[in-house]
Amino acid sequence: MAFKDPGKAPVDQEVAIHRIRITLTSRNVKSLEKVCADLIRGAKEKNLKVKGPVRMPTKTLRITTRKTPCGEGSKTWDRFQMRIHKRLIDLHSPSEIVKQITSISIEPGVEVEVTIADA
């Protein structure tokens, strides 16, 4: 049987490291890339393991509609489209540090989704 010495307290408390996925979506590519670069710069300053940004395929939403409201006249059509860009960033770190990193100012129009899983 092994006995612990009651005089010594544990020196290191191990912090749980999580696998964190940050998903960024936006219609504006420039603001999306700026937020992405800020997040990665903040993570690298804290010496975290970073993977990304992974550029996901752009979704293009299209709507085709008639120009004239009454239905008379020549059949002319308007075509509208909206492009949605998406980026993924993977981090390996404690969740407290991620709260500090994601507290940066995020551009308007950029949506951030954070998913936390155990490593």
Swiss-Prot record:
> What GO molecular function annotations does the UniProt record carry, in alphabetical order?
RNA binding; structural constituent of ribosome
Which top-level group of life is the source organism from? Eukaryota
> Per the annotation, which location comes first and is thus the protein's main one?
cytoplasm
For the keyword Thylakoid, the answer is no
Cellular compartments annotated: Cytoplasm
Question: Briefly, what is this protein's role?
Answer: Component of the small ribosomal subunit. The ribosome is a large ribonucleoprotein complex responsible for the synthesis of proteins in the cell.
**How is the quaternary structure described?**
Component of the 40S small ribosomal subunit.
- Matches recorded under HAMAP family: Ribosomal_uS10
Protein family per UniProt = Belongs to the universal ribosomal protein uS10 family.
**Name listed for the protein in its UniProt record:** Small ribosomal subunit protein uS10
